[in-house]
Design a protein with these regions (language model features):
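Polytopic alpha-helical membrane proteins, predominantly small-molecule transporters/carriers
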Residues: 1-412
Length: 412
């Protein structure tokens, strides 16, 4: 178990789980900026921050005469590919968060990305997992079990509100049944007893009125149905699109970080320096340096792809879109900063611990962080103590599962 990789994964997941917070602020929702416009602010922060990383490196590089043979910057095409995966993932997130909510969007994207990443890198790319003996020519793996537990915890976090509602409904139904049985027993005793108890009759008839399961008037039912995006005719298609794009966004996020690990592995094989970097050429080492050339190349790719999309949007509209500077100069910049922090730590974690296990840990932390913001900051969904209790239990279960999953990867 690489504890430094786990720490990077948790820090990255917390940052990634926080950046959607600024997508659904009241000002942003009211302004309704185009997803590409919001992405432009994020890409600009990523582009500029990459060059900020080079400033302290340039100072050390210029003062150290022994490092003149080591280049300050080496362009990396794998970073461009990673950025090409990142842009769609970001666009799908920006589109779906205001529709289905921050907690559900992150949970859906994390679940799809976690399953795809683990299966692809274990079964296709050959990431080794610990096996356990069960006899002669018999072995089994615990990694799929812990992956299943991680996904189960994710699903529980997603549907914690609905589960709470079902539990509360079951308890209320039982209370109503007990009150109805008490009422029937009282009426049966009155039938056998010649004494008329008017007071008891009045008490029995009002039992249902004090029940927490009070009947909703038909008009109110219709209004609730029409205002719910999951059930209304107008909102169901948009809600479904938000759910679908959240799942697809998780798949693109997996490709973003897959380009880091697989690209580095391919280049090391071509340079005959796998698995240790000490014998690799200086240009190869620098091109995949998270603090330097890799991030600068990623920022260049992100900005280039975003500008191309913006040009296409302008051509389709016949004019430049509204950039909403007064609103997005704060929200877009903050979202970009938290994404930069998340990408920085997650890239470190992937390079240190591999993609198969690290991404499951990152995505689990993202779900817990976004869920906390949804419960505490935005007050999303049911705020009852029962729902919070179920959510905490599911969060702890998910954390333990992802830690145990980390122990299953063979460290090399």
């Amino acid at each position: 178990m690489l504890w430094d990789a786990l720490l990077y994964a948790i820090l990255g997941g917390m940052s990634f789980g926080t950046y959607p917070l600024f997508i659904r602020t009241p000002a942003v929702i009211q302004a309704k900026p185009h997803t590409i416009v919001f992405q432009l602010y994020k890409s600009s922060v990523v582009f500029l921050s990459g060059f900020l990383f080079l400033i302290p490196r340039y100072i050390n590089w210029s003062n150290d005469t022994n490092n003149k043979d080591v280049p300050l910057f080496v362009f990396n095409w794998w970073a461009i590919l990673s950025a090409a995966f990142w842009i769609p993932a970001g666009l799908f997130t920006i589109f779906s968060v205001p529709i289905i909510g921050m907690g559900l969007q992150v949970s859906l994207a994390a679940s799809s990305s976690s399953i795809l990443t683990f299966l692809a890198f274990w079964l296709i790319f050959g990431t080794e997992m610990k096996s356990y003996s069960c006899g002669t020519d018999c072995k089994y793996y615990l990694a799929p079990l812990y992956l299943f537990c991680t996904v189960l915890g994710m699903v529980t976090l997603i549907f914690s509100e609905k589960l709470t509602a079902r539990i509360r409904k079951h308890v209320c139904d039982n209370n109503i049944d007990r009150k109805n049985n008490t009422k029937r027993n009282t009426e049966y005793k009155r039938y056998l007893t010649p004494i008329i108890e008017d007071e008891e009759t009045e008490t029995g008839s009002s039992a249902d009125e004090s029940s927490p399961m009070v009947a909703i008037p038909p008009v109110a039912k219709r209004q609730l149905f029409e205002n719910n995006p999951e059930t209304s005719t107008n909102g169901f298609g948009r809600w479904t699109a938000g759910v679908f794009l959240s799942l697809v966004g998780g798949i693109f996020a997996s490709g973003q970080f897959a380009a880091v690990q697989q690209g580095k592995k391919i280049e090391q094989i071509n340079a005959n320096c796998l698995p240790k970097n000490v014998t690799c050429p200086a240009t190869l080492i620098e091109s995949f340096d998270t603090f330097g050339s890799w991030y600068v190349s990623f920022g260049i790719g992100a900005m280039a792809v975003t500008v191309l999309l913006l040009v296409g949007l302008s051509c389709s509209l016949g004019r430049c879109p509204n950039f909403h500077w007064n609103v997005l100069k704060s929200a877009g910049t903050k979202a970009g900063i938290f994404w930069v922090l998340g990408n920085f730590f997650v890239t470190l974690a992937v390079v240190r611990g591999g993609n198969a296990v690290i991404m499951a840990q990152v995505l689990s932390t993202m779900i817990i962080t976004s869920g906390c913001w949804g419960l505490i900051y935005y007050k999303e969904g049911d705020q009852s103590s029962l729902r919070k209790f179920l959510w905490i239990i599911a969060a702890v279960f998910t954390l333990l599962s992802m830690i145990m999953l980390g122990f299953q990867k063979i460290d090399k």
